[in-house]
Every structure is written in structure tokens, then in C-alpha cells.
Curated annotation (Swiss-Prot):
SMART domains linked to this entry: WNT1
Cellular component, GO annotation: extracellular space
Organism lineage string: Eukaryota, Metazoa, Chordata, Craniata, Vertebrata
Tissue distribution of the protein: At neurula in anterior neural fold; at tailbud in dorsal midline of midbrain.
Low complexity composition-biased segments: 261-270
Protein name (record): Protein Wnt-1
Its biological purpose: Ligand for members of the frizzled family of seven transmembrane receptors. Acts in the canonical Wnt signaling pathway by promoting beta-catenin-dependent transcriptional activation. Plays an important role in patterning during embryonic development. Plays an essential role in the development of the embryonic brain and central nervous system (CNS). Has a role in osteoblast function, bone development and bone homeostasis.
Length: 371
């Protein structure tokens, strides 16, 4: 009996070690491509000489995978588009979380969002979804603007669309955007564990959100603006709309667990591993829901493990009962009030023709800072 117990213990340790290694592999690859936001520019793509053409050379500091490099070489202009999309995602993340304990801090280097990407919490889910959405949105827009040589407007919609309108114009190329988003972003995921499935799900949720937020725009034709006939096309939403939708899904994110129907094997085509809600009474998450598998840290104190700075020194709202209020944002530690001088433009006048002149007015305001 003791021998059996000992062997079972060894098996458990081996499984845990293998799982830990799998997680490490996934962590080492996840989000590496985000580093392009700090180094990507036109100078990172170097063409060969006219006398002896050679393949494009990418700056090694980008630390991209072979598939990602191939996509960049095959689609001139796409590196800049992906970089713009990542910048948009970072701005959107900081905007939506500006008043929360975790305010989407970013830094230099390859791990732009820090060690939070190694976790499996709600914040991690939002980061993966918004960055995937940013790439999809930016690439789709770049196609219709002619910034990427290998794609253009989406001309699949043609002909009559209804009794008084027809498809035409230049629809944003959402399908090419989703293709690049999937091939470029998802290729950085490695492993066969829960984190791998969760990251892929949230990447897909980000791309689908861009698709579902697209809207039809039309232009009227007819005598004296009668609008007897319209030409319509599909237009990408403002990226703020995408961020709003993903923030709503962050608030309603589903906690999930890994399921392979009790099998110890990775799975087969007929029975692949999948995500299930941790609470069996909850519905399965949809393809657009954000998912996570561990509770978020409280983000109150600096954490080397999570790479988060804590909330000391953050400006809070002393009259708010919400997340930006001093009681919640400062985690009960209290706050200090400081007088701060603010200089603003004032007493502006319009001068013919054509400029505006203003004075600089200085005032004092009280700000509250977490201890």
C-alpha cells in the first residue's frame, strides 16, 4: 500500500512539473510581439540593394517568430499598421482603466504590459483582447487606405442590397484584418494548457468584437437630394466603440476551467479540449465573451510577481464612492491633500483675420494623493 501511495505521489509530482514547464513555455512566447511598439519603424525593414536583391531584413530586437516575420515580408506596410494598432490598443486600455487600481501600466522592452500577462485574471484577458482587436482594426483600415500593398478595399459586396440601395464604395477589409490578426497574433501562443486556450479565446473575442461593431454607411443619389437611391458600404467603428464593448465584456467575464472529458490525452479532432465555466450552473461562454481562470490580485501594493506598482501616489477623487474614490483606490490607507498650481489658457479673443489670442491664467486647485 505504501509503495502504491509513493508511486501515485511521484506521478502527481511529474504531472505538476510538466504542467509548470508547459506554462513556462506559453509565458515565454505570449505577448512578445508587443515589443514592436517600442522599436518598430520604417527603418526596421531593410530592403536589399538594387544590384543584388535579398529578402527583407527585420531588426532582431523585434524578437518575432518566423511566421510573423514571413507575414511582414510578404505584406509590405503591415509592420507599421500592426504598430499603429498596438498603440491604439494601449491608449484604449489606459483610458478605460484610468480610474482603477490596475490602470494598465506599460513600459519599455518586450513585455510592454509587464508580468500581468503571465497571469490568468480578467485584466490579462482584456489586454489580449484589446491588442488583438487593435491589430485587426488597424490592418483593415490600412487596406482601404492603400497603405498595405497586398490588400485593398473589400469588394466582395456588390450589386443590389435592397429595394432602394446597392452595395458599392470602399468597404473596410475586415476579413484581411482578421486574417492577419489570427496569423500574426495567435502564432505567439505556445502550449497545451489552460492558459493557451484562454489566450486564444480572448484573442478571438477581440477580433470578433471589431467585426460585430462594424456599421453600414450610405451615400444618397437622386435629383435635388431626394435620396431615391443609395450606395452603401461597410465601415469600421471608431476604436473607442470596440474598447467600450470589450470593457463591458471585462465586467461580465466568465471564469473557466479546462475540460477534455476526463481524458489524459490532449484530445482528438472529434473531442478537442475546450473551456467550460467553473460554475456548472453558468452557461458556456460565447466566442465574444472574455474568459479568465484565476482571481485578480488586489493591486494595492507594489508586486514584483505581478509587475504592478501599487496605488501609492495615485490621484483620487475624495467625493466619489466609485472605483476612483479615495477609499477604494487608496485601499483604505488614506490620502493627503495638496495644493497644485494649474496654468490654463483664458480670455481668448478672435482676431481678424485669422487667429486667436489668449492669456495664461494661473489658479490653485486641491488634489488628493493616495498614501
Amino acid at each position: 500500500m505504501r509503495i502504491l501511495t509513493f508511486l501515485l505521489g511521484l506521478k502527481t509530482l511529474w504531472v505538476l512539473a510538466f504542467s509548470s514547464l508547459s506554462n513556462t513555455i506559453a509565458v515565454n512566447n505570449s505577448g512578445k510581439w508587443w515589443g514592436i511598439v517600442n522599436v518598430a519603424s520604417a527603418g526596421n525593414v531593410l530592403p536589399g540593394s538594387d544590384a543584388r536583391p535579398v529578402p527583407l531584413v527585420l531588426d532582431p530586437s523585434l524578437q518575432l517568430l518566423s511566421r510573423q516575420k514571413r507575414l511582414i515580408r510578404q505584406n509590405p506596410g503591415i509592420l507599421q499598421s500592426i504598430t499603429r494598432g498596438l498603440h491604439s490598443a494601449i491608449r484604449e486600455c489606459k483610458w478605460h482603466f484610468r480610474n482603477r487600481r490596475w490602470n494598465c501600466p506599460t513600459g519599455t522592452g518586450n513585455q510592454v504590459f509587464g508580468k500581468i500577462i503571465n497571469r490568468g485574471c480578467r485584466e490579462t484577458a482584456f489586454v489580449f483582447a484589446i491588442t488583438s482587436a487593435g491589430v485587426t482594426h488597424s490592418v483593415a483600415r490600412s487596406c482601404s487606405e492603400g497603405s498595405i500593398e497586398s490588400c485593398s478595399c473589400d469588394y466582395r459586396r456588390r450589386g443590389p442590397g435592397g429595394p432602394d440601395w446597392h452595395w458599392g464604395g470602399c468597404s473596410d477589409n475586415i476579413e484581411f484584418g482578421r486574417f492577419i490578426g489570427r496569423e500574426f497574433v495567435d502564432s505567439s501562443e505556445r502550449g497545451r494548457d489552460l492558459k493557451y486556450l484562454v489566450n486564444l479565446h480572448n484573442n478571438q473575442a477581440g477580433r470578433l468584437t471589431v467585426l460585430t461593431e462594424m456599421r453600414q454607411e450610405c451615400k444618397c443619389h437622386g435629383m435635388s437630394g431626394s435620396c431615391s437611391l443609395r450606395t452603401c458600404w461597410m465601415r469600421l467603428p471608431p476604436f473607442r466603440s470596440v474598447g467600450d464593448a470589450l470593457k463591458d465584456r471585462f465586467d461580465g467575464a466568465s471564469k473557466v476551467t479546462y475540460s477534455n472529458n476526463g481524458s489524459n490525452r490532449w484530445g482528438s479532432r472529434s473531442d478537442p479540449p475546450h473551456l467550460e465555466p467553473e460554475n456548472p450552473t453558468h452557461a458556456l461562454p460565447s466566442s465574444q465573451d472574455l474568459v479568465y481562470f484565476e482571481k485578480s490580485p488586489n493591486f494595492c501594493s507594489p508586486s514584483e510577481k505581478n509587475g504592478t506598482p501599487g496605488t501609492t501616489g495615485r490621484i483620487c477623487n475624495s467625493t466619489s464612492l466609485g472605483l476612483d474614490g479615495c477609499e477604494l483606490l487608496c485601499c483604505g490607507r488614506g490620502y493627503r491633500s495638496l495644493a497644485e498650481k494649474v496654468t490654463e489658457r483664458c480670455h481668448c479673443t478672435f482676431n481678424w483675420c485669422c487667429h486667436v489670442t489668449c492669456l495664461n491664467c494661473t489658479s490653485s486647485q486641491i488634489v488628493h494623493e493616495c498614501l
